[in-house]
Every structure is written in C-alpha cells, then in structure tokens.
Amino acid sequence: MLRFAPSPTGDMHIGNLRAAIFNYIVAKQQYKPFLIRIEDTDKERNIEGKDQEILEILKLMGISWDKLVYQSHNIDYHREMAEKLLKENKAFYCYASAEFLEREKEKAKNEKRPFRYSDEWATLEKDKHHAPVVRLKAPNHAVSFNDAIKKEVKFEPDELDSFVLLRQDKSPTYNFACACDDLLYKISLIIRGEDHVSNTPKQILIQQALGSNDPIVYAHLPIILDEVSGKKMSKRDEASSVKWLLNQGFLPVAIANYLITIGNKVPKEVFSLDEAIEWFSLENLSSSPAHFNLKYLKHLNHEHLKLLDDDKLLELTSIKDKNLLGLLRLFIEECGTLLELREKISLFLEPKDIVKTYENEDFKERCLALFNALTSMDFQAYKDFESFKKEAMRLSQLKGKDFFKPLRILLTGNSHGVELPLIFPYIQSHHQEVLRLKA
C-alpha cells in the first residue's frame, strides 16, 4: 500500500500535492491500494475544515483513494505500541522537565556544540512528580537507507539520541504515530519531501524496535525553489498554495501536469494524470531542487484551456449561450488562466465603463459620440466588419486612433485584444448586450 499523509494545519502546499500525485501514480502503476491518512494528532495546530479542503483538492486533481483514515483514531494503538516497547526495555520513561531540557540546550548553544539528549537525565527529576514522557533508546549504530532519489543516506550514532515517542499527556509524537501507522497499514513505499529526511532514521528505528521485517522504501523529493529569490517556497509565498493557484484560474489538470514536469524527464509537454501513469518513473526524477516558474505554468494552463471540450468550457466560464463558444475559443488564444478568460467574456457582455477607461474629457466625448452613432445603426445590416466600420466612422465623424480605441472599448470593454473583424459576428448577434454603458 502507498499513502499520502497531509496535516490539516493550513493550505495545501504545491510540494505536498506533488508528493500526493507521485504516490497516487505509483500506486496505480503497481496495482496497490492508495491510502489517505489525515495526520491530525497535533490538536493545537489543526484548522477546522482543512481536512475537507485537502480532500476536495485531491478530487479536483483526479486523485481517488481506496481508504481514508484519521491518525487521531489510532491513538490507542499508538499507546499500545509504546507500552510494548517499554515492556521489552526498548523504551523508557523520562522525567526531565521542559525547563531542565531548555537549560541544557542553552548550555550546548553557548559551548557551540549540537544538543543531544543524555539518557542519564531520565530520572534526575523523578522526585518532582513530573508526568513522564516515553523515549526510544538511542541506537549504538548508524542508520542508513537507500533512497530511491537521493541514493544512500546515512546517520551516524552521534546524530541520533533517545527521542520522544509519547508526550506527557500520552499523545504520540509525529514520528511515532507516523511509524506505527505505516506498519499498521503495511505501507511499502513512501514518496515525500526531502524536509522529512531527518525524520526517516527515527521512523526506521521505531519500526525495527517494533519487530518489522519489511523495510519501507523511501523516496525524498527535492524542494521547490522560488523563481525570484531562489529560496525554498514557503507557505507565505502565494504561488505555493494550491488553493491560490486554483483561485487564480489555473486548471487542476494543468497544475498536475506542471508538478509532474518540474525536475523530471517527461516524454511530452502537455499531458493528463492518466497519461502520466503510463510512463512515470521515479528514476527520472532529479535529485536537485526544482525551480518554480509561474510563466511556464501559465503556458501549460493555456494549452489545457485549448483542450477543454465545449461543455466544460461553458461550465467553467458560466456561459449558457452555446453561440458564444467560438468567441471563447478566440479569447483563449490571449489567456493564460481561466480568470483572464472569464474577465474577457465578462467585459464583452457587461455594460462598458468609459469613466474608468477614458484618458481625458476629450476621449470621453469621443466615446459618447461614437456610442450614439452605434446605437443608431442596425448591426445585422452589415455583411462584414469593413462595411460596419465605414458607416460608424461616417456617423461619428471620427477616424484613426480617435475612432478605433473608443470603438474597441465600447465593443469589447478592452483597449486591446482579438482583432475586431474576427469577433464582429459575435458583436452582431449580441449587440444588445454588448453595446451598453455603465451608469
């Protein structure tokens, strides 16, 4: 079984979605069940409704799952596993207070050495009646694993100490809950971000202590860097939020296409998730950081907009009139996002705001003069844009730039865009909606 294990503590990050996509693809390729595990044990950081938001995003991306579990529902199992480790003398109670540990951390910092927990501290404050934590005994050997992307990764004994499994309130730590659940659901491969590399030796040690003989294969994805700063994209970067990208009008299929493409060798530029299942391979992923490029994502989105079938295009633009499909196709040529396309069609059909667009009083007067001329014309009487244009120029007594700029604004709501002769048939058929001024 493969899994995707998000925490409901904020908006879904593109790095998390990338991991979800890759786990889903490999599960499909290997005909293995796919598990979604909501890691909700950190009650203080959980945000109500974020779990459902994550699931909705996965559905939008075309990702389905065979099983959905909430980690908090397994808390009795986690405590049972901790008790097993205590009985087998693989774990121990530690009574050291947070204040004591903080002093030791400060001492290590002042002495310019890494902080490592010492097992000798476990019972120093036992008589103070602190509720103890449960720690796994530190290993006396190195922990290594062969990462499917990063190759061999090794942690020496002095890099690992006796770490906490259960907190004072008997709630499991992230690494303990994660390791227990991966065993419980027989997870065979974990694809996740490289920020989890330091968690992996701890999870391996927990699984070994619990008697696991089936090592999990790990694949840690390189981080995604911001295109401007070159730094890791954080949750503070708008474009790192999948929700933000969707709200900006990027299609789910285009986002998935892009996240599969970056840092990867792909056989074609534009593809669907189902197509990627046919050829995706972890071996083709680079071990170097990927650079986020919003401009390229926009390009891919433009290509996917062109591939939308008629019914989907009408649905996504909230246009009920099928006679406008041809106009939408023309507008797509100039749009990178669904938001831009919606804006173009809205400006075309809505009353025109010349107050917002006019440059000066003279320009406003030209717009009004042309508007009056246009309202006196029978749009259906002209066989083409050329004959319509000549009559409009004659009636308005305008020409050149003084004519064309007001004309485009009055007919499209925009000062630039698709050639007017191309969209003139749609202007003719919808002139009563098109030729209106905002009050």
UniProtKB/Swiss-Prot annotation:
Motif ('HIGH' region): 6-16
A Pfam match: Anticodon_2
Stored InterPro entries: aa-tRNA-synth_I_cd-bd, aa-tRNA-synth_I_codon-bd_sub2, aa-tRNA-synth_I_CS, aa_tRNA-synth_I_cd-bd_sf, Glu-tRNA-ligase_bac/mito, Glu/Gln-tRNA-synth, Glu/Gln-tRNA-synth_Ib_cat-dom, GluQ/Sye
Main location: cytoplasm
UniProt keyword annotation of Nucleotide-binding present: yes
Subcellular location: Cytoplasm
GO cellular component, one term: cytosol
Binding site for ATP: K235
Functional summary from the UniProt entry: Aminoacylates tRNA(Gln) with glutamate. Does not aminoacylate tRNA(Glu).
Subunit structure: Monomer.
The protein's name in its UniProt record: GlutamylGlutaminyl-tRNA synthetase
Species of provenance: Helicobacter pylori (strain ATCC 700392 / 26695) (Campylobacter pylori)
